[in-house]
Each structure stands twice: as C-alpha cells, then as structure tokens.
A protein has these predicted regions:
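Short, charged beta-strand/loop "edge" motif centered at a coil->beta-strand transition
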Residues: 2-33
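C-terminal boundary/linker segments immediately following FHA domains
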Residues: 5-7, 28, 36, 43, ...
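Acidic side chains
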Residues: 12-14, 41, 68
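Short, solvent-exposed loop/turn segments at secondary-structure junctions
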Residues: 13, 48-49
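Short glycine/proline-enriched turns and hinge-like loops at secondary-structure junctions
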Residues: 19-20, 41-43
C-alpha cells in the first residue's frame, strides 16, 4: 500500500493554484496492494469531486479509476491517471 498526498504546497503531488481554491493538504490517494485507488478529501475548504455519469459528485472518500476525472477546489480537474504522473520525485 502506498499513500500520496495532494495539495497546494509541500505534498507528493503539487497543484499550482494562485487563487488558493486548493488546500495545502487537500486530499490523499491510496494505491492499494491490489492496484486500486482510494481517494480521500482531507477536510479541504473547497472540496473534492469525481465526475460520474456526466455530473460532478462531491466525495469525502471513494474508490476511483485512473480514467475518472477528479476535481479539486471547484475548478482544477484532471483524470486520476494524469494526476498520478505529476508525482514529485524525492
């Protein structure tokens, strides 16, 4: 199992956001031992949503697939697969 943090600053995956719609620590995605992805909103100010059946569904926690579109802070959206490619090397 591997956990990646997502946010505006100091996280594994940094989302640039001059408007500060994305929290410093906005969400976490856990890659499970069987290869699934579990997305958790970390109490962000502006929420996390997944696009399902053509509509944005706010989530606190949910399993998501690589091809699903995820939205952070009301405007920053991309597929989970694209997001995972943005991981910083340490």
């Amino acid at each position: 199992m591997r956990i990646l943090t997502i946010g505006r600053k100091g996280t594994d995956i940094v989302l640039n956001d001059s408007e500060k719609q994305i929290s410093r620590l906005h969400a976490e995605v856990t890659v499970t031992d069987d290869g699934r992805y579990y997305l958790v909103d970390c109490g962000s100010s502006n929420g996390t949503a997944v696009k399902r059946q053509g509509a944005w569904k706010p989530i606190k926690q949910a399993f998501v697939s690589e091809d699903e579109e995820v939205r952070f802070g009301g405007f920053y959206s991309l597929t989970l697969g694209t997001l995972l490619k943005m991981k910083r090397s340490k």
